[in-house]
Amino acid sequence: MNSNVENLPPHVIRQVYKEVSTLTPDPPEGIKIIPNEEDITDVQVSIEGPEGTPYAGGIFRMKLILGKDFPAAPPKGYFLTKIFHPNVSSNGEICVNVLKKDWKAELGIRHVLLTIKCLLIHPNPESALNEEAGRLLLENYEEYASRARLMTEIHAHSSSLRGKDPTDPCSSASVTGALGDGPMAKKHAGDRDKKLAAKKKTDKKRALRRL
């Protein structure tokens, strides 16, 4: 594991430890801190998808990596849960101004986490790392929202499935959640109905032969 603890001054380590220790029992609403006692510079959290967004109902894991120049330089943020979002790259990297040009050394971890949660409510297509998501957000919101909801259902919806693994391809909850009421769901339903009708016809013929 690449840890930056040994590269940070003792007073910075104490500052980070104090803030994480304060945040863990009292985090911002919809955010849970997952402390890493072995490496305080690797801050992992889970964020609830905000209501009224395509991410609602999802639980998204992410992490902040505090580099050797922290807090003079901003932490790097990564989503560990796959997400379809203009400001999140394919490898999970998060693009938000507070982690770049708007960073100030006095901004704490709480502020960063709240900013990232806000990004789920108000994506910024102007600084897109996922160009397709940014384009759809501007040109076809319904398609963007549909793609984002599908990714949420597949990768981030475990909390509402009552013990069933949503990533298990054999899970009926996974298939139902992923397909929803879209054309794929209708196609599968149509195929199933045809098979049932054919089976009924065969059974009827067999019954008539017996008479």
Curated annotation (Swiss-Prot):
Role of this protein: Catalyzes the covalent attachment of ubiquitin to other proteins. Acts as an essential factor of the anaphase promoting complex/cyclosome (APC/C), a cell cycle-regulated ubiquitin ligase that controls progression through mitosis. Acts by specifically elongating 'Lys-11'-linked polyubiquitin chains initiated by the E2 enzyme ube2c/ubch10 on APC/C substrates, enhancing the degradation of APC/C substrates by the proteasome and promoting mitotic exit.
Catalytic activity: S-ubiquitinyl-[E1 ubiquitin-activating enzyme]-L-cysteine + [E2 ubiquitin-conjugating enzyme]-L-cysteine = [E1 ubiquitin-activating enzyme]-L-cysteine + S-ubiquitinyl-[E2 ubiquitin-conjugating enzyme]-L-cysteine
PROSITE patterns: UBC_1, UBC_2
Gene Ontology process terms (BP): anaphase-promoting complex-dependent catabolic process; cell division; exit from mitosis; free ubiquitin chain polymerization; positive regulation of ubiquitin protein ligase activity; protein K11-linked ubiquitination
Residue spans of biased composition, Basic and acidic residues class: 157-167
InterPro entries referenced in this protein's UniProt entry, alphabetically: Ub_conjugating_enzyme, UBQ-conjugat_E2_core, UBQ-conjugating_AS, UBQ-conjugating_enzyme/RWD
Enzyme class: transferase
Family recorded in the similarity comment: Belongs to the ubiquitin-conjugating enzyme family.
Enzyme Commission identifier(s): 2.3.2.23
GO molecular function terms attached to this record: ATP binding; ubiquitin conjugating enzyme activity
GO CC entries: anaphase-promoting complex
Protein name (database record): Ubiquitin-conjugating enzyme E2 S
Keyword line: ATP-binding, Cell cycle, Cell division, Nucleotide-binding, Transferase, Ubl conjugation pathway
